[in-house]
Amino acid sequence: MKAPRQSARRSQIGGRPRRAEKKESTRQAILRAALALFAQKGFYRTTTKAISLKAKIAEGTLFNYFETKEDLALYFLDQELDGVIDWFHHDKRVQGAPLPERLFSIIYLFLERLAPYEEFIGAVYLRALQPSSKLSPLSLQSQEHNVRYLRFVRDILAEAEREGEIPKVGDIGAYAFALFHLAMITYWLQDRSPGKEQTLAMLDRCLKMATHLLKKGAWDW
């Protein structure tokens, strides 16, 4: 009688990854449906009912995965962060580049990934300004995402410190870059130049200036 119980136990263990994969697949399907509707109708005019119909699931099932559209937005931002971190860790050329180029590449890739969803991102950032929003930097729901991003940036700056590219900046360097990143996204949202070229020029100039100031402590850049 032991063998059947062991077999059942193995079946249960083997079923867990499959259930997790199915749940993640459902989350991805919901996100794709939501992003398509956000592009058509906008973030505010898209209802959870419309998202569930587009994703071909019951509205109650949608709420099991995402309580609100803000939860969907947080999931989207997590997916984008995962993509950028994975890209950075696999791109040896960027990892070996000077610090300004590494930091430029990170923000550039974020902007490139966000470009198809510009209106949605604008709505998300406006919601993030509301203290009661889950998207607010002060909310508990957004803290895990923010800390992962800060650690990612801090690791890059720490390597630059070890290589002597910049003096020790500690955690404040990661916070400063995060604020700069936010400022660049805000500028990008307002940029109406062809190909957002003004944003890219501003990004390049600011990073070169900041790195020079850290290394030389002078304004002659």
Segments predicted by a language model, with ranges:
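Amphipathic alpha-helical packing segments from all-alpha helical-bundle domains
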Residues: 135-162, 171-182, 201, 209
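Amphipathic alpha-helical segments used for helix-helix packing
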Residues: 114-140, 151-157, 186
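Hydrophobic alpha-helical connector segments
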Residues: 75, 89-123, 143-144, 148
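N-terminal intrinsically disordered/low-complexity leader segments
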Residues: 1-25, 36, 220
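Helix-turn-helix
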Residues: 2, 29, 37-75, 79
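Amphipathic C-terminal alpha-helical segment
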Residues: 174-196, 209-220
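Secondary-structure edge/capping motif, primarily at the C-terminal ends of alpha-helices
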Residues: 88-95, 124-132, 160, 188-192
